[in-house]
């Protein structure tokens, strides 16, 4: 059994070894796995979810710029080029088609797209997979600046230290899907 509450602005890292139930818990929260538990969301909670396969769900026929332009709203629209540059898609890189991007580039693009969505709770399942050191640092900076709450699965202390307000070690969990 798990019973927890995520407070506004809290940034929680689920840490532990492979196979300890971190991603399973996330999949239960996201209703991707049947279970007997309940999830109660607070008033006006909007979840943005980054699954481990999120980068593969991007439209391969769009360019990097089009992918972000499609989701950006309001004041963000005037900052698209700056945001693309911050995620290492400046200049010509923003004109590349998604289908020619590397795994790390796709992951960066999928994460940037998620950060632009009008959500206030991010649930990220191993968001640093396929990212190089510079991309991880940029993601960490963006998540630190994010005003909403974050629950993320991570294996890398150098990433979650200084980002997470709380670190939940999953090594003592017993994860059973009933």
Predicted regions and their residues:
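ABC ATP-binding cassette signature C-motif
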Residues: 1-178
């Amino acid at each position: 059994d798990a019973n927890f509450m995520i407070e506004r602005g809290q940034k929680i890292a689920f840490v532990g070894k492979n196979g300890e139930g971190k991603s399973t818990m996330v999949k239960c929260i996201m209703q991707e796995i049947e279970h007997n538990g309940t999830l109660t969301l607070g008033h006006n909670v909007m979840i943005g979810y980054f699954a481990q396969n999120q980068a593969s769900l991007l439209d391969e026929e769009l360019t990097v710029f089009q992918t972000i332009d499609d989701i950006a709203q309001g004041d963000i629209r005037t900052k698209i080029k700056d945001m693309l540059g911050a995620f290492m898609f400046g200049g010509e890189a923003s004109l590349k088609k998604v289908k020619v991007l590397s795994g790390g580039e796709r992951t960066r693009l999928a994460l940037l797209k998620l950060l632009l969505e009008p959500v206030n709770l991010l649930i990220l399942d191993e968001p640093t997979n396929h990212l190089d050191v510079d991309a991880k640092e940029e993601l960490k900076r963006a998540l630190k600046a994010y005003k909403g709450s974050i629950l993320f699965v991570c294996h890398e202390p150098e990433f979650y230290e200084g980002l997470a307000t709380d670190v939940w070690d999953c090594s003592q969990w017993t994860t059973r899907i009933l």
